[in-house]
Structures are given as structure tokens and as C-alpha cells.
Amino acid sequence: MKRLATLFVLALLALLAGCSGLRVVDSQVLAVASAPPGVQLQGARYRFERLPSQVGNPEAGLAEQQAEQALAAVGLVRDDAGAQLSVLVGLQGTQYLADPWGSPYPGTYGSISIGRGVPWGTGVGFGMGMRFPPPTQYRREVSLILRDLRSGQVVYETHASHDGPWSDSKTIFATLFKAALANFPNPPAGPQRVNIEIPR
């Protein structure tokens, strides 16, 4: 019996050790491909495009570096001089205090309940509940808009978002760019969930 318990504890420790090295970034992704006949997305050459508000913004440069790695992983090649496509990169992140269910925390909360005992008595109660301090959650979103330079038409658009407790934005944004390009260049219709494991 003692030997069986020892084996069980060792198996449990091995399982916990295996789980502790990775975390899952679950992303909500919406991608739309609208390339006309004759426009080849796979292996296409591209350059980055910036909005006036992004010029000189250091975050835009970091976003482009991360997007470039994700674009290279699906076969697109950066070539500023010979580009067929332009890529507009979007990146946004916010943080908020979360209630116990993961929604933005509205402040203090409580409840008042009035009841009647069975078969006798009545009662009134008041309760307050709050965690100290409420946990911080992070919402991050990325987008990529690929446009054919000859026609000016958008040929591929994708958005990915993630809500979670991790504060390492650089790693999470890089993972979101990978998720945004899942199933490139033929994404399924409608929203999809993309899970990517990354080290803790």
C-alpha cells in the first residue's frame, strides 16, 4: 500500500512539473480573405504602411517587428522596394481590475436578502464581498490589414484578442500576431478560438 501511494505521489508530481512549464494563450480571432483572382497571398512580398498617428511611435516599430516574424512564419517576405502588398499593423492593450468572474471590476458590491424560515421565523441579512486587492487583467488586441498595392484593395484582414492575467505584453503580443495568422491564407468563416502554448 505504501508503495502504491509513493507511485501515485510521484506521478502527480511529474504531472504538475510538466504543466508548470507552459501556459496557454487563448485568442479570439476573426480573419477575412478577399483576394481577387490573380492576387497570390502565399509567398507575397510586402512592406509596412503606417498611419500618420503611428509615424515616430516606438510601439509601432515594436509591433512591426513582431508582425514581421509572424508574417515570415506563414511565408510572406518583407521587401520594401519590390512589395506587392502593404501591411498595416494595429496594436492595443489595456489593463483593468477584475471581479471574481473576470469582468471589469465595478467597485464594491454586496447583497441584501430577506427570507422566511420554514416553518417558522423570518430574517434579514446583509452581505458584502470583495477580494483585496482585485486581480489585474490585461486585454490585448492586434490587427493586420493586407492591401494589394496595384488596386488598393484589402485582400486579407485579421484581428486577434486575448484577456488574461499575464503582464508580459511583449510575449503576449507576439503570440497574438501568430494567432491572427492561423490558417493563413484561407481562414474559416466567422470567429475562431486559437490556443497557443508558450513558456511561463
Segments from the language model and where they lie:
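"Short basic amphipathic alpha-helical interaction patches in structured regions
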Residues: 63, 101-105, 158
